[in-house]
């Protein structure tokens, strides 16, 4: 007989499969009596018929109940300080959009309803999560302009991010109404999307089973993926670490043992930097952060570790984390202690893709709070088609960052993973865009390096274009090996 734990695990797996199907099995009611169903790559309206609750409806209710606990656990890692929903996911996006759908009429109503089902289908493959702050403050919700809104495109997945073959594979599996077939199709598509590029899982990792959440590719820098920080306030559609968020431990980096992590640092005196990444380390409460980093308040502890970097989007996706969340002051006090008592450099590696992210007083207040704690903020972002592939956007972004005391750091190129084909920009165009943006910028903004790309051997920068033997060629150099 199987143990209770194993039975529970099997039941949970089955219910999650049912939940997958439940999210997309029922046609979407348009609030006015009609329904909308996805057919191929388009949508159509249909007649609405009421009927007694079916077994499928019951399955949907059971599935929704089974995943409710997981949703609550996921968002409980930091205290909410704002609206009803701290995060919008595929499970509650319909509730969030209901007000906008109800307030719309005619074609606008239809477009919003179509978008909702498109999001729910795409989110079966790509992780979807968006903070209520972003939904309320950074997105223009005019249905006519959504496709042109950079923040909407940055955060809301669409089936168009998949190849036509993968779209059809997903739609066929969904149409079968078999949750096992749908789960298998989703897993196969994700595998085709190269979930951990450039040897992320096989290279530059210690062999110890106690060190499953660190990478040591460059001599001076160790990456830490704390297990409790492997989620974000919002998931970027282009995120190259999307595999961290799909619930598959086989492709996930996560460090649970803080003692083993600190021991590793002590065994490697060549290290000077630790980059805490994920996910987002600022999704964690301060107590969890301290379990990994608290000892660095003591200047005699591992003195060769001089720089603590935090890879984060919290600054513009949930700025309340540094201003009004329940433990915001405790977090800032801890960062300040690392600087003033521990003698460490605390660097916030802020992922900022568009100048609109820095347009709110909430973001500016968060910037000032971090700076007052002694942290240095540096900005970086990939260049992505339809989001920020415009020299004027980059020039405005860098100008605003310099105004706020943020140091422009990197312009990256899309990595070979996820929806790379949907978002990538040709190398020649990326180089020209960088040059055009730099020309519009003052010397203070010219700290930004790029366009650069990470690959298996190291980090490469496109330095220029030259004529070699009568042909144009890119001039590149390694920034790190």
Name every feature range the model reports, one short phrase each.
Residues 7-10, 14-47:
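N-terminal chloroplast transit peptides
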Residues 32-70:
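N-terminal, immediately post-signal peptide pro-regions of secreted/luminal proteins
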Residues 120-124, 212-213, 225, 251, ...:
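Short, charged/polar micro-motifs that form catalytic or ligand-binding hotspots
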Residues 227-235:
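Cysteine-centered iron-sulfur cluster-binding motifs in ferredoxin-type domains/subunits
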Residues 429-481:
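C-terminal accessory extensions appended to soluble enzyme cores
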